[in-house]
Amino acid sequence: MLRHLLRHENNKVFVLILLYCVLVSILKLCTAQPDSSVAATDNDITHLGDDCQVTPVIHVLQYPGCVPKPIPSFACVGRCASYIQVSGSKIWQMERSCMCCQESGEREAAVSLFCPKVKPGERKFKKVLTKAPLECMCRPCTSIEESGIIPQEIAGYSDEGPLNNHFRRIALQ
């Protein structure tokens, strides 16, 4: 399969970036050590177990009528401490802290998708903008207004489309 991908000049850069992402992931796994620097006390449980990192992924860009294009990208993956406890000053109240692994800054890229089934006079390449996180960190989870959420069935993406298998994780064995 690698030989097939390397036949085309455009794919060589993609394969090199993909191999780089795999090597970075392997290095992260091999050099990862348990975090013994976190000393949890009864009053300090806010960062216990935080592990939020930028992770290489393959992002499949899709647009109706165009050939899907896998590109190397990044995503925020990990876990962040969340807790609920009795308030220290008001014992009849509870203190809550919900943290989520989220991006802190993002990068944007323009990618051209090949669209073979266009009408005469239309361009065969569609420019698509994509975003990826610059860095990741544990931040307070934000709520999303329900009115802004469109169910996949209504949007027409239940079986196919850009929301289905949007990111694929690189499998390391």
Curated annotation (Swiss-Prot):
The gene name on file is Burs
Annotated localization: Secreted
Principal location class: secreted
What effect is documented for mutating G148C? Answer: In allele Z5569; wing expansion defects, failure to sclerotize cuticle
Give the PANTHER family listed for this entry: BURSICON, GREMLIN 1
Sorted alphabetically, the keyword list is:
Disulfide bond, Hormone, Secreted, Signal
The UniProt subunit note reads as follows: Heterodimer of Burs and Pburs.
According to the UniProt entry, its GO molecular function terms are:
hormone activity; protein heterodimerization activity; receptor ligand activity
GO CC annotations, alphabetized: bursicon neuropeptide hormone complex; extracellular region; extracellular space; terminal bouton
InterPro entries hit by this protein = Cys_knot_C (IPR006207), Cystine-knot_cytokine (IPR029034), DAN (IPR004133)
Q: Which domain of life does this protein belong to?
A: Eukaryota
Please give the tissue specificity annotation from the record for this chain: Expressed in one to two pairs of neurons in each of the thoracic and abdominal neuromeres of the larval CNS. Coexpressed with CCAP in most CCAP-specific neurons. Coexpressed with Pburs in four bilateral neurons in thoracic and abdominal neuromeres of the ventral nervous system.
The entry's stated outcome for C115Y is: In allele Z1091; wing expansion defects, failure to sclerotize cuticle
A single BP term in Gene Ontology = border follicle cell migration
| Cystine crosslinks | C52-C101, C66-C115, C76-C136, C80-C138, C98-C141
Task: Identify the Pfam families for this entry.
Answer: DAN
Q: What is this protein called?
A: Bursicon
Q: What does this protein do?
A: Final heterodimeric neurohormone released at the end of the molting cycle, involved in the sclerotization (tanning) of the insect cuticle, melanization and wing spreading. Heterodimer specifically activates the G protein-coupled receptor rk.
PROSITE patterns (UniProt xref): CTCK_2
